[in-house]
Curated annotation (Swiss-Prot):
Family: Belongs to the acetylglutamate kinase family. ArgB subfamily.
Positions bearing the site annotation: Transition state stabilizer: 44, 266
Compartment list: Cytoplasm
Signal peptide residue numbers: none
Pfam families per UniProt: AA_kinase
Lineage: Bacteria, Pseudomonadati, Pseudomonadota, Alphaproteobacteria, Rhodospirillales
GO MF: acetylglutamate kinase activity; ATP binding
Name listed for the protein in its UniProt record: Acetylglutamate kinase
Organism: Rhodospirillum rubrum (strain ATCC 11170 / ATH 1.1.1 / DSM 467 / LMG 4362 / NCIMB 8255 / S1)
PANTHER family: N-ACETYLGLUTAMATE SYNTHASE, N-ACETYLGLUTAMATE SYNTHASE, MITOCHONDRIAL
Length: 310
């Protein structure tokens, strides 16, 4: 006697396709989790990624994930637009030389207040809200970033004299003392650092966030320095993304003029960090959601990777 039997149920009938895709993505990330477990990832955080509320939340979750899977993320943040708005509110005029904010005594107090106060604590709060345990620091804490006054010179073609430009309390790192950060390596703590340096006599110095991140990454021999920016990365002459560069190739592109404008100091920071022991530095498009995870956990990445010449 024949009986009708119900057709077999399709495999995964009750599992949404999106979940299967997420599971596959997690599985593919496993080799990268092993590769970077226990290693330091320094992230320079700024630009659109920091100014957009949704991207800020995404960034915080991504940093927490890095810590949860065994990496040691260190966040160094900027805050130029926020500083500018506060100076405008206080009616303190800003002047720039070669893209650097001239920082007098009144301005440096505002810079420290905005960077080490409001911005730093906002990032810490965002990371903690995402389930992490972030602690805010400035370069003054534990004498983490010891700095000196930056000296800039400019040649005057009319007089043929090289003039020294006074940038005020704009500094450059001379010593990075990472002992405070080393204490956090084997803990759940994620350090978030404002780029404020301390001088030999206790002065406060305003330090470019890219420069501070590069110096910290070099001192800690980080596996990666990620520089979040508002561009795709380094572009070739046809405006196409260059996914990877050697230090030598990066220097050549700079000489040829392919790397120009605001990209020059970022590439120079990456080159300096790599030559001082960072395994690779990456200029990452911070406008892309989950750009940090894409860079660490996928073969293609999310920007331009610069590594030592072979």
């Amino acid at each position: 006697m024949m009986t009708d039997s119900a057709p077999p149920e399709p495999i995964h009938a009750e599992i949404p396709e999106g979940w299967l895709h997420k599971a596959k993505t997690l599985s593919e990330a496993l080799p990268y989790m092993r590769r970077f477990a226990g290693l330091t990832i320094v992230i320079k955080y700024g630009g659109h990624a920091m100014g957009d509320p949704e991207l800020a939340k995404t960034f915080a979750r991504d940093v927490v994930l890095l810590k949860q899977v065994g990496m040691n993320p260190v966040v160094v943040h900027g805050g130029g637009p926020q500083i500018g708005r506060m100076l405008d509110t206080l009616r303190i005029q800003s002047t720039f030389i070669d893209g650097l904010r001239v920082t007098d005594a009144a301005t440096v107090d505002v810079v420290e207040m905005v960077l080490a106060g409001s911005i730093n604590k906002a990032i810490v709060t965002e990371i903690n809200q995402a389930g992490g345990c972030a602690v805010g620091l400035s370069g003054k804490d534990g004498r983490l970033i010891q700095a000196r006054k930056m000296v800039r010179k400019r040649h005057d073609p009319e007089s043929n004299i090289e003039r020294v430009l006074d940038l005020g309390f704009v500094g450059e790192p001379v010593v990075i003392d990472p002992h405070v950060l080393i204490q956090f390596r084997d803990s759940d703590i994620i350090p978030v650092i404002a780029p404020i340096g301390i001088g030999e006599a206790g002065e406060t110095f305003n330090i470019n966030a890219d420069t501070a991140a590069g110096a910290l990454a070099a001192q800690m021999k980080a596996a990666r320095l990620l520089m979040l920016t508002d561009v795709k990365g380094v572009l070739d002459k046809d405006k196409q993304l260059i996914q990877e560069l050697s230090v030598d190739r990066a220097r050549l592109l700079k000489q040829e003029g392919t790397i120009s404008g605001g990209m020059i100091p970022k590439v120079e920071t990456c080159i300096d960090a790599v030559e001082r022991g960072v395994e690779a530095a990456v200029i990452v498009d911070g406008r892309v959601p989950h750009a940090v995870l894409l860079e660490i956990f996928t073969p293609r990445g999310a920007g331009t990777l610069i590594r030592a010449s072979r």
